[in-house]
Curated annotation (Swiss-Prot):
Domain of life from the UniProt record: Bacteria
Family (UniProt): To E.coli YhaH.
Subcellular location: Cell inner membrane
Membrane topology (UniProt): Multi-pass membrane protein
The keyword Methyltransferase belongs to this UniProt entry's keyword annotation: no
Record protein name field: Inner membrane protein YhaI
Side Cytoplasmic, residues: 47, 99-118
Keyword Flavoprotein found: no
Periplasmic membrane side: 1-25, 69-77
Cross-referenced InterPro entries: DUF805 (IPR008523)
Gene designation: yhaI
Main location group: membrane
Ranges annotated as spanning the membrane: 26-46, 48-68, 78-98
Length: 118
């Protein structure tokens, strides 16, 4: 839960770097929260996904900021995040980038998050 909350605290922090662990732990918890919200909507019998849409809006900027910081960790520009808008191929490329180990030591986006804070 600490990984999830730390990303939310850095709500619009687009600079710096994010480790794979931070990215994937946030993504996992985000998916679990989304699933719980969907179950609640089913129980309440909501025809339109109001709660899901509200949650997506609330987490859009933190998810985008985290994705950009993750790209920075691999020494890539945040502009690569535009691949989110290219179905399948773009998502596959981003998946590879997000799974790639970050550059060791400092890079143009900051210090290595494995060895201290940015």
């Amino acid at each position: 839960m600490q990984w999830y909350l730390s990303v939310l605290k850095n709500y619009v922090g687009f600079s710096g770097r994010a480790r794979r662990k931070e990215y994937w732990m946030f993504t996992l918890i985000n998916a679990i929260v989304g699933a719980i919200i969907n179950v609640i909507q089913l129980i309440l019998g909501l025809e339109l996904p109001y709660l899901s849409m509200l949650y997506l809006l609330a987490t859009f900027l933190p998810v985008l900021a985290l994705a950009i910081r993750r790209l920075h960790d691999t020494d890539r520009s945040g502009a690569w995040a535009l691949l989110f808008f290219v179905p399948f191929i773009g998502w596959l490329v981003l998946l590879v980038f997000f799974c790639t180990e970050g550059t060791s030591g400092s890079n143009r986006y900051g210090n290595d998050p494995k060895f201290g804070s940015n």
